[in-house]
From Swiss-Prot:
This is Interphotoreceptor matrix proteoglycan 1. Keywords: Cell projection, Disease variant, Extracellular matrix, Glycoprotein, Heparin-binding, Hyaluronic acid, Receptor, Repeat, Retinitis pigmentosa, Secreted, Sialic acid, Signal. Chondroitin sulfate-, heparin- and hyaluronan-binding protein. May serve to form a basic macromolecular scaffold comprising the insoluble interphotoreceptor matrix. It comes from Homo sapiens. Residues 232-354, 571-684 form the SEA domain. It is found in: Cell projection, Cilium, Photoreceptor outer segment; Secreted, Extracellular space, Extracellular matrix, Interphotoreceptor matrix; Photoreceptor inner segment. The N-terminus is blocked. Highly glycosylated (N- and O-linked carbohydrates and sialic acid). One of its GO terms (molecular function) is extracellular matrix structural constituent. Coiled coil: none annotated. The lineage of its organism: Eukaryota, Metazoa, Chordata, Craniata, Vertebrata. The gene is IMPG1.
Length: 797
């Protein structure tokens, strides 16, 4: 059936073709004979009859031949119609070219001269003016450069740089005086400090302004020398940990070949990196010391001192004062002895914050160095003496001997100005004369609180080699002493003697161990050790008026450095911390420590935290959950450590808790707020803040344990927590508290039976304790008698 249908269609198509051929032949015949046989008046009638004889398919083919062609698009986006002539096409292309050029010219003029994005209206106006050829392209640039907005902006940026006695200030009246007058600006504008990042020689600044004047205006050499004669040097000290470099004993000796080799290699590598920074002069390797990473591996920490140039009247950070020129090139020309040096970079003077940010970025981006952590110490930003040529590759001080990065206690801020570092090579000092200065033993408060590696120098006259300091002592960093306890440990603080610089380095490196041993041998506290026998009466008898706002204060401070934390003799290191679990709902049962919910949550946090703390913190001993508070769930806790730990306690605990927070969020779905982490060592913390005693309780110091505890005010007592007490529910003689739904733990008056039961339980506990003591004493007596009997029996035999 399908084949028959196709065959029928094919036959019909052939028939149409044959019929059309016949019609064409008839038309040709009639066209040849119409002028002879027929008069003109019958022409219209015959043509109409012939049109009707033509087939429908033929008319379709004829219409297809005369169909209009599609319009062609050029790659530029210009539409060219087939009906247009060549002249019209060229005019369209030129109009499109003029539009695009004007759009780009106006946009770049706003960006370069006015440093802003134009409004739609003013942008269209300038594009229309450009298309009408009212101004040529360069006239538009001159218009923008001579505008008052551009001149005000340029004056503002130039005045933000501090150049003493500038002679090239531009006045608006002079600039706008004559329409055809060329703007003249000194070439020193090219030397304006542009920003915190180093500028490459390919950059250009204000091309249109400086291009015509750089070759004509030259600043005299004497002027430049006077302008930049007073230069100061800025010193930045930092410590860099080398992850893949294990510490060796030879690095403790600055004269060993291995030390010299590693110091020279490190100095060359650092010079290549620091040369990219603006104003860099030189760098010194101060020394090396061992460092223990978080994963337990050992590495080497290197201390460096980098020296940069800076202007005497250092301005604020220039990062916010810049024009954003994007891809616009900035030319940098230097006028030196009357000649132009285009390949020289302009000098840029940065603040200490800018330098630290640039140094960190440069070291982190350097792939050839395996840099772990970068830590900046206090930099000495004062004016330094004008040194001669740099003859030493590194300072002769052994970094392993000196403890740096000392953590200061808030009670004793540094009030003395820091000492400047004096290069021993410039004063003719030998390597063995590098020693700390002698300290006057008058008062601890009058002495500088600590010394760092960069602030130690020899007390010598210039040109001499013998040192004056023979009895040298060094203060313990971070030691803060109240006035009442000064007499007890004044000898300790001034008795740690620094060995002479000419002695063996092994004796110097053992200074930290001697300090710890000396502290262990000497009891810094006059308070007796806690008794081993438990007592029922835990609270000190304090008058009522003394209970108001009583905050226990630690008698002695911890000795804290970057490498160790030491507690006073007879005590343990204690750290308070709190954290907030955001995705956990608070319940009123968490007010009461005897409730099942409190115990379950306490056990949960203990099981989570204790293994994590024990595996990550050396010397960890005990974790105590103090309480839970409302605010989602706030967990207040206390940790106890050994008497000394080999790290900075506060920083280490903070780092471990941050890691725990991340692990808990990923594995346990506990959302611990990072901003809620509050870590305070016991020597600086207010323990009452973490205890959160409540409205009807008072934070006092326990005489037996010497720790802060919550004590009820007169008429109140508690089995658990007193937070959320309501006034009026308790009175004198109150002994117990109960938890009410939605009200926390308000006190209530106990009845006689309850009070009797309470007294009975107390007596029962006392009897149990007495029985234990009696049974222990009896067992000891029996043991002694048995030994005496055996001895007599042996002698008798």
């Amino acid at each position: 059936m399908y084949l028959e249908t196709r065959r029928a269609i094919f036959v019909f198509w052939i028939f149409l073709q044959v019929q059309g051929t016949k019609d064409i032949s008839i038309n040709i015949y009639h066209s040849e004979t119409k002028d002879i046989d027929n008069p003109p008046r019958n022409e219209t009638t015959e043509s109409t009859e012939k049109m009707y004889k033509m087939s429908t398919m033929r008319r379709i083919f004829d219409l297809a031949k005369h169909r209009t062609k599609r319009s062609a698009f050029f790659p530029t986006g210009v539409k060219v119609c087939p009906q247009e002539s060549m002249k019209q096409i060229l005019d369209s292309l030129q109009a499109y070219y003029r539009l695009r050029v004007c759009q780009e010219a106006v946009w770049e003029a706003y960006r370069i001269f006015l440093d802003r994005i134009p409004d739609t209206g003013e942008y269209q106006d300038w594009v229309s003016i450009c298309q009408q050829e009212t101004f040529c392209l360069f006239d538009i640039g001159k218009n923008f450069s001579n505008s008052q907005e551009h001149l005000d902006l340029l004056q503002q940026r130039i005045k933000q740089r501090s150049f003493p006695d500038r002679k090239d200030e531009i006045s608006a009246e002079k600039t706008l005086g004559e329409p055809g007058e060329t703007i003249v600006i000194s070439t020193d504008v090219a030397n304006v400090s542009l920003g915190p990042f180093p500028l490459t020689p390919d950059d250009t600044l204000l091309n249109e302004i400086l291009d015509n004047t750089l070759n004509d205006t030259k600043m005299p050499t004497t002027e430049r020398e006077t302008e930049f004669a007073v230069l100061e040097e800025q010193r930045v000290e930092l410590s860099v940990s080398l992850v893949n470099q294990k510490f060796k004993a030879e690095l403790a000796d600055s004269q060993s070949p291995y030390y010299q080799e590693l110091a020279g290699k490190s100095q060359l590598q650092m010079q290549k990196i620091f040369k990219k920074l603006p104003g860099f002069k030189k760098i010194h390797v101060l020394g090396f010391r061992p460092k223990k990473e978080k994963d337990g591996s050992s590495s080497t920490e290197m201390q460096l001192t980098a020296i940069f140039k800076r202007h005497s009247a250092e301005a604020k950070s220039p990062a916010s004062d810049l024009l954003s020129f994007d891809s616009n090139k900035i030319e940098s020309e230097e006028v030196y002895h009357g000649t132009m040096e285009e390949d020289k970079q302009p000098e840029i003077y940065l603040t200490a914050t800018d330098l630290k940010r640039l140094i960190s970025k440069a070291l982190e981006e350097e792939q050839s160095l395996d840099v772990g952590t970068i830590q900046f110490t206090d930099e000495i930003a004062g004016s330094l003496p004008a040194f001669g040529p740099d003859t030493q590759s590194e300072l002769p001080t052994s970094f392993a001997v000196i403890t740096e990065d000392a953590t200061l206690s808030p009670e004793l801020p540094p009030v003395e100005p820091q000492l400047e570092t004096v290069d021993g090579a410039e004063h003719g000092l030998p390597d063995t004369s590098w020693s700390p200065p002698a300290m006057a033993s008058t008062s601890l408060s009058e002495a500088p609180p600590f010394f760092m590696a960069s602030s130690i120098f020899s007390l010598t006259d210039q040109g001499t080699t013998d040192t004056m300091a023979t009895d040298q002592t060094m203060l313990v960093p971070g030691l803060t002493i109240p006035t009442s306890d000064y007499s007890a440990i004044s000898q300790l603080a001034l008795g740690i003697s620094h060995p002479p610089a000419s002695s063996d380095d092994s004796r110097s490196s053992a200074g930290g161990e001697d300090m710890v041993r000396h502290l262990d041998e000497m009891d810094l506290s006059d308070t007796p050790a806690p008794s081993e026998v438990p007592e029922l009466s835990e609270y000190v008898s304090v008058p009522d008026h003394f209970l108001e706002d009583t905050t226990p204060v630690s008698a002695l401070q911890y000795i804290t450095t970057s490498s160790m934390t030491i507690a006073p003799k007879g005590r343990e290191l204690v750290v308070f911390f709190s954290l907030r679990v955001a995705n956990m709902a608070f319940s009123n049962d968490l007010f009461n420590k005897s409730s099942l919910e409190y115990r379950a949550l306490e056990q949960q946090f203990t099981q989570l935290l204790v293994p994590y703390l024990r595996s990550n913190l050396t010397g960890f001993k005990q974790l105590e959950i103090l309480n839970f508070r409302n605010g989602s769930v706030i967990v207040n806790s206390k940790m106890k450590f050994a008497k000394s730990v080999p790290y900075n306690l506060t920083k280490a605990v903070h780092g471990v808790l941050e890691d725990f927070r991340s692990a808990a969020a990923q594995q346990l779905h506990l959302e611990i707020d990072s901003y809620s982490l509050n870590i305070e060592p016991a020597d600086q913390a207010d323990p009452c803040k973490f205890l959160a005693c409540g409205e009807f309780a008072q934070c006092v110091k326990n005489e037996r344990t010497e720790e802060a505890e919550c004590r009820c005010k007169p008429g109140y007592d508690s089995q658990g927590s007193l937070d959320g007490l309501e006034p009026g529910l308790c009175g004198p003689g109150t002994k117990e508290c109960e938890v009410l739904q939605g009200k926390g733990a308000p006190c209530r008056l106990p009845d006689h039976s309850e009070n009797q039961a309470y007294k009975t339980s107390v007596k029962k506990f006392q009897n149990q304790q007495n029985n234990k003591v009696i049974s222990k004493r009896n067992s000891e007596l029996l043991t002694v008698e048995y030994e005496e009997f055996n001895h007599q029996d042996w002698e008798g035999n």
